[in-house]
Amino acid sequence: MNKPLRYAMNVLSVRDYSEVEIRRKCAAYLYKSEGTESEADEAIAQATAEDVEAAIAYCKEHGWLDDARYARRYISSRSRKGYGVQRIRMELSQKGIDKTTLTTALNESDIDWCILAKSVVERKFGHPLSDEWKDKVKHQRYLLYRGFFHEEIQSIYTNFSD
């Protein structure tokens, strides 16, 4: 068993990662462990890149590395923490999840983003939301920062009468 595979298995045993994250982690691990700073030999770099690819293929083959599963779990986790679609989409794209996988995972999630936005703003600012203009702007800024769309934010004031 080569070093990248052992490292990838250890890292994936703790929590899920995307394929791009595992590739970066394995490359950083090899860079630190082999001391390639002084020996910038292309043959060594090529061999380690092949080892990393082999480790990723092995992990995918055994079901330990799955971007779709990672995206579903990430969406579930971040939505429970009060983040909206825009923020989750941006974070997952930074983690290397492609747009089709991301869109599929978002469509599969049965989250009502309007209700989530209302619960997030009530948790932050208290239950009866103020109708004052200054407070509405404050609520809107907060929800935009959390990644909610304007339509979801407006629905707080139009769809919920309480």
UniProtKB/Swiss-Prot annotation:
Coiled coil: none annotated. InterPro entries: RecX_HTH_2nd, RecX_HTH_3rd, Regulatory_RecX, WH-like_DNA-bd_sf. Pfam families: RecX_HTH2 (PF02631), RecX_HTH3 (PF21981). Gene3D superfamilies: Winged helix-like DNA-binding domain superfamily/Winged helix DNA-binding domain. Keywords: Cytoplasm. It comes from the Bacteria. Modulates RecA activity. PANTHER family: REGULATORY PROTEIN RECX FAMILY PROTEIN (PTHR33602:SF1). This is Regulatory protein RecX. The gene is recX.
